[in-house]
Amino acid sequence: MNSQANYLLPVPLSSEKLCARGFNQSWELARRIDCDKHIHKNPHILRRHHHVQHQAQENRANRQIAIQGMFYINPQYQDCLESASVIVFDDVMTSGATLNEIARVLKDNGVSRVINWVLLRTLYPSS
């Protein structure tokens, strides 16, 4: 499983949603992926600022706007990302807005390569 990556990171939930649900489904799946020992799995590097309303009915443009500025890097891990290759794992991808925003944040913080792994892809109407 992609031996060139340094980290495997799940898409984070907001603290509100994590407390309500009790677990991050992306992390529960990602931590069970059998990958090379040197790929560090870590649910604490990526953080989400706050919860927004459920976006299931939003069009692609509105999703991209709503997700801007939503994610950040935990300052405790900032230095370890310099020139790293990172796999971002999401359970379900709809428009790709979340993964695009996370990739932007990671690259803005020194990551050299972002690879997206997605378990399921929804059918999304073009709009």
Regions found by a protein language model. Give the residues of each.
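Conserved PRPP/pyrophosphate-binding segment of the phosphoribosyltransferase/PRPP-pathway fold
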Residues: 1-88, 95-126
